[in-house]
């Protein structure tokens, strides 16, 4: 069984995406961004797909998490209990969804298949 070209880079991109969400937020994102900036242009189509998807969804997903939470806090009031209930529910739901989609992306990368993240992934087609 032959390994598709770019499979290891695709798996690395998806792994860094999950590490960014679960273990080292920010640090893993910077490593993923450097990997994208240095390897995307000459990457095989499989690797380019996973690099573009993980980097793009990390940027947009992170921006949406932060901006919506700030909007909820500003609109709901910093000292209101219900504001924090909504913030925790929103963060838990969106963060868990991003993790689940990242696991699906990792499975597809390990299988040597292309993957597009639902909703946000259309913006980052290679």
Model-derived features with residue positions:
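Hydrophobic alpha-helical transmembrane segments in multi-pass membrane proteins
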Residues: 9-30, 56-102
């Amino acid at each position: 069984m032959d390994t598709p070209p770019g499979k290891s880079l695709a798996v690395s991109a998806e792994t860094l995406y999950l590490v960014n969400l679960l273990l080292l937020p920010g640090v893993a994102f910077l490593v993923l961004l450097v990997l994208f900036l240095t390897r995307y242009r000459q990457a095989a189509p499989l690797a380019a797909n996973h690099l573009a998807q993980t980097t793009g969804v990390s940027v947009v997903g992170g921006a949406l998490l932060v901006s919506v939470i700030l909007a909820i806090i500003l609109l709901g009031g910093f000292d209101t209990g219900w504001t924090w209930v909504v913030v925790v529910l929103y963060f838990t739901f969106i963060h868990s969804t991003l993790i689940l989609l990242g696991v699906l992306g990792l499975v597809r990368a390990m299988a040597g298949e292309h993957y597009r993240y639902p909703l946000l992934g259309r913006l980052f087609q290679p």
